[in-house]
Amino acid sequence: MKLHFCSQAASSFPSPNPSNFLLPVASCLIPALKRLRTGYCPNITLGFSFQKLCIPDTSMCNFPSAPCTKPSERRCLLEFKARKGYKNRNGPKAEKRRPYVRAHAKW
């Protein structure tokens, strides 16, 4: 299900029929919807593919791909950055790089 939050009004949010899931999601996303209806964000989907500069404040939401703010959720944050295509500067490529040392100096 795809929702363009910035182009639609907040009243067009789907009605929470399964209240166990959609009601807490709607209650924490509606303030983010009101902030994002400025035209700055062209497209935010519910398919867990947030754009880079348009991540809403979903700290109260339980989304798997929302950026985590607590230090105990660092693994989730790293997984989120890996999905977003951030450069992993401490990855295996950084471990393979060694400073060049000349074994035999030629005089």
UniProtKB/Swiss-Prot annotation:
Name used for this protein in its record: Putative uncharacterized protein YGR051C
Top-level taxon of the source organism: Eukaryota
| Start and end residues of each stretch annotated as Disordered | 87-107
